[in-house]
Amino acid sequence: MKPPIYYPIAIRLAMPIYRYMVHKKSQHLPTYMREVKERFGQTYLPAPTAVHIPVDNLEKKVNKSGCHGRVIWCHAVSLGELNTAYPMLKILLNQGFNLWITSTTQTGFNRASVLFEPLLGTRVNHSFVPVDNLKTIQVFIEHIQPVMALFIETELWANTLYELRQRQIPAVMVNARLTEKSYQSYAKFPKLSTSMMQNLTAIIAQDEASADRFVRLGADKVKVSVMDSLKWSSVHQLSADNQRLIQQVQMWQGVSHRPIWLVGSTHDAEELLAIQAHKKLIEHDPATLLILVPRHPERFDEVASLCQSSTFITHRRSKGERIDPDTQVYLADSMGELLAWYAVCDVAVVGGSFVDVGGHNPIEPAALAKPVVMGKFIKNCEELVDGLSKVSALTITDSASQCLADAVASWLFDEDAAHQAGMAGRQLVVAKENAATKQAEQLLIHLSITDSTTNQSD
């Protein structure tokens, strides 16, 4: 179904503005020229064509006949979406497919470089997502020649979906979610939304409410299915570096026999809330330690200044400082180490949920058997929060320092209760960890149907 006539006109008019925005945001970055060329369809790296042995051994195999070397395009907006999709993408690699990853953000682009580093240039390549101009999209698709396109969670582009449909390339929305707020925004443009819904081959929603909203936007009900969120499978094994870090931290004199709580993936205002709550927890036990892990590296110095102004004795990971017996707040201002810090703490508070961000992934601490506390802004992870709450592994509290302190204290100073909650969460994660396998199998079914249809038409 063709997008309404106003959409391609609006995209063309917006392209100079978008180019300026890219310039303003990325001109100081080493990837700037590459980003400009890729977003506007000028130059791309070669498409992956190599055929390699599986990435790792998987217990469950499906027939890989005819899939070696074929490219699946996966669009993941940023770091979070790519982390979520990673277990499923590994399964597709193990089936013999190659991957082309696109990202909207710099953090997503950088994460792809890390996750797929050994395979880049052979079985995997990545780029910034091209602007949704029809000619640009045609250049991109012609270059990578995908047999399927995957869109992780939320971001869709009408011209892209139309071009994929014209080329009979299946387009699947994976781990799809649609909040009521997003639904209302899409519903303001009914013809545009209907065109996108109609041009999708399938929508794998992560909850019934999202599935219903997609249907109301114009998706055929038969195209929409509901499966457990990929986030249940998204906890990667601790890297060797993280395992070494855990061992090192556990040997530091300032760690043993102390109640430790952590606030991870924090955003502006959440660190102040944590520090205010920490003042109340220290009144209960002066040995209590707070570990802060900000979400964005550009805020590390800002958070450090906040901690130092609080009068708490603060040490920083980026300065090579350890947790000493007198450390009251430890700023883990590093990237790629969040899981290690979760492993060290007794109670985990997941950020992005005390301000209107939508909440980050509670599965990460739950998988490590840590009781979890979150705020009420959880639109990005409602299904996960509901599941963990039902087994009493997670509690929701208000964005007030006393409420946060009380919620943390109920586990931090009750070892048995914390252990019981942590194990309940861990058991739930284990029970649902095959979510990636199930969604990958669904994708392979759609591919086999497409192959069969293509062969018949030939």
Each model region followed by its residue ranges:
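Nucleotide-activated sugar donor-binding and catalytic core shared by glycosyltransferases
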Residues: M1-D458
